[in-house]
Amino acid sequence: LESEHWDIVPGGKYYVTRNNTSILAFKVGTKLDNYSFNIVTSHTDSPTFKVKENAEIEVKNKYTQLNTEGYGGMLCATWLDRPLSIAGRVLVSEGNSIVTKLLNIDRDLLMIPNVAIHMNRAANDGFKYNLQVDMLPLLSAGDDRQKDFKQIIADELGVKKEDILGHDLYLY
């Protein structure tokens, strides 16, 4: 833990995690006569779409969209007309405990479709996408089409649907 005493030695390599979402790692130089340091950072969470809680939107009893929110600056067009899936963390009740399970649905599950040109004549004229209207993914579950989104997650994790308490899921 960050708050515990660390025995730092020349040439040592160390890491710590925060909230099971971040890792901070560093290596100590072998010569400590120069007390300078370099910092390198990166993140892999942006841009993306975060799946909202109670995400299913049934449209005219014909198809299902997932309610998402855009995260980070993105080029919307790069998300269109390609197979997408979901990964992240799911909180599950196990007995008297709440456990975090990692989820990666490693198959095509979603798509954010472009609409036909006759339905959007401005598509080639600098069309401005509305993330809450134009960029909601369609659930294209294939063999899972009779299941709701939460059941797909439960099946993937091998848990009961009613034991899922929450999630932190993202499209990729």
Listing of model-derived features with the role each one plays in the protein:
Residues 1-172:
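N-terminal hydrophobic/helix-forming segments and targeting peptides
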